């Protein structure tokens, strides 16, 4: 659904133009109904696994839609949303396998995924800055945002390492 909402911009992007919707390999008339079926299937599987997995899948789908249609144009909020979506995947994996994610894992993932999401934005900002700022307006960033995003990403990456180090040194774990 996110790729379908970005189809015109993706067609103009040097790397994203090869995505199925943007390249024309998959029609949105086929892909969007199929994604609806997958969402329904995910909810059904979540319901089979129990109320908590069902709620987690539902929250993921709602948050994904919120990101697709609004948050991805908001500075920094988009990065927090991506981080949240990644963390929900970890939680769902734990629920599906019967191994609940520990607070250590969730803290590590929060900082690590935040760093990765920032790296994604830094790449987009730097690429756009090299091309005169083309393509940034739909994301809410400016070419001058790169240094701040980089500092935040590095700090978050260090925090994930700190959480991992504290976990390793903890006598209880």
Which residue stretches match the model-derived regions?
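Hydrophobic alpha-helical membrane segments of integral membrane proteins
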Residues: 52-59, 73-83, 104
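Membrane-embedded alpha-helical segments that form the functional core of polytopic membrane enzymes
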Residues: 1-5, 51-67
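C-terminal membrane-associated helical module and adjoining short loops/tails
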Residues: 69, 80, 87-173
